[in-house]
Amino acid sequence: MTKRTIEQILDELRRGRRPLLADKPAESDASRYDCLRCKDQGGYLVRQNGLEVWTMCSCMAERKVKRLLGASEITHAFRQLGFKEFRTEGKPQAIKDAFECTKEYVADYEQIKDCRKNSIALLGQPGSGKTHLLTAAANELMRTCYVPVIYFPFVEGFTDLKNDFALLEAKLNRMKQADVLFIDDLFKPVNGKPRATDWQLEQMYSVLNYRYLNHKPILLSSELTIEGLVRVDEALGTRIYEMCSDYLVIIKGAAYELNHRLEGVR
C-alpha cells in the first residue's frame, strides 16, 4: 500500500467519511449512522502526545451485547427482566434464598465457570419466579460479561424439534457448545407426572452429558426436586446435582404463599 493511499484513508477517518458513502445523497448524520461518535466505524482517531491514536468506540460493546441477546433465543420481553424487577419484599424465605443464590452465581461466574460445580438450579414450586431469576442471570451474563447464552424452553423447544427433525442435529450441537445453556422447565409435569419421553430423555442426556464432561455451565429451572429428577433418570439427575450443588435452591411450601400468580386469591 502506497504512502499516498494511507494518507487518504487517514483523511477519510478524520472527516468521518467512508468511501462507499461518497456518492450517496446528503443525509443528516443522525439518519445515516447508528453511532454518531465513530460514524459506525467501531473507533475514531484522538490526538495523544502529538500523535493520532485509534480508539475503540463504546458502541462496539453495545453491538456485541445486541448480537448476544439476539442469538440467545430469549424473547424480547424476557430480555427486559432483571434482578431489579424481582420483588422479594413480603415473600417467603425460600424466594429470598433463590434471589440471593442467583445473584451470587452471577457474581461468582468468572471464577467458577471452568469448575465441575459451575451451574445453578432453581427447583420446585411453579410460579415462584424461577424463570425470572434465571433469565435475569442470563441477561446479566450477556450484558456485563459478554457471555453467549442459549435459552431452551423444554416443552416448546422439543415441540419445535419434533415438528422439524431437520433442525435437530444443529440445535443439539448449539446446546452442547454454548458457553452457557439455560434450560427452562425441565420435564415439566402434566397432571403431576413428569413430561419425559424416551426420545426427550435421549436428547437431554446427550446434551447434558456433553456439558458435564466438558465443564460447561447450565442454568436450570424445573418443578421437580433433585429426587424427582433422579427418578426420571438417575444418570441425568445425578449429573445435574453434581453440576449445580453449590448453587441449588429447592422452593417448597404453600402454593398461595409461593406462587405469585395466586397473590390476592385469599
UniProtKB/Swiss-Prot annotation:
InterPro entries: AAA+_ATPase (IPR003593), IstB_ATP-bd (IPR002611), P-loop_NTPase (IPR027417)
Protein family (similarity comment): To B.subtilis YqaM.
CDD domains: AAA (cd00009)
Keywords, sorted A to Z: ATP-binding, Nucleotide-binding
Pfam families: IstB_IS21
GO molecular function per UniProt: ATP binding; ATP hydrolysis activity
Protein name per its UniProtKB record: Phage-like element PBSX protein XkdC
Biological process annotations from GO: DNA replication
